[in-house]
Amino acid sequence: MIRSILTPLVSPRFLTDIRYREGHLRVVNALPQRRVLGLHVPEMQQTAKQISRCGAEVELSEGNRKKCHNGEEVIRSFETVPNDSLCHEEIVIWGYLINLEKCTLPERLTMLEKYVPVLDNWAVCDSYCANAKWMAHANKHELWAFLQPYFRSTREFEVRFAIVIAMTYFMTEEWLPKIFEHFNTLNIPRIHSAYRYEKGKPNLPQQGTAQGPQPYYVRMAIAWHLATALAKYPALTRAFIRTTFLPEDVIKLYIRKARESFRTREVAVM
């Protein structure tokens, strides 16, 4: 949709250095059908800021171009095009534009309702969540209510979205027990993942594989959240771990994440 704006920003090294390109694609690990142009976060952030201020000419379909005069009009255009026509970077920038809008909380949440179902990759999801600084100042009760359907979703990255937002903006003594309650009631086997489990690193990048049982990116998000909670609220976290119904593999991932972090490598995990 805005690929004509993004393509000139791609690093020549991404286009010419096979090892560099494969390294980038392995980190992003987009699904095979999702095109990745090769832009990095700072470039996408700068592009989003420019579009938010000045708008952009967008391509809604082949030969059907439209001039959008501001970020909101570009967001509305993103909402109308088929999801599978968008590249990885376009989806990331769509999310950044939502974060940059000057609007009310209900208006922003309405935009998010159309955006969250498009998330199909950990990098898109986590990049959006880290960039959503407005959530730190939003009405927490309204925002928490908005997250509830995503905690209960059967789609991998809708659930991951709720978990990462909770970790980033609800990591307090007040909210942590509510988050733990959600973890205990997650029906992990019924969460669908488009990634298939494959041991070891695939020979080629972007093969639609993950190095753990489905839904791998939900399991990893829970482990990441728990390891982060251990750093801030060790007693609360250990009490939850001792009584949780989470699968054993998720607990092992949590322990591994805790041991990898300099903040918790010497902290008791159980």
Predicted feature locations:
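Alpha-helical scaffold domains
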Residues: 1-270
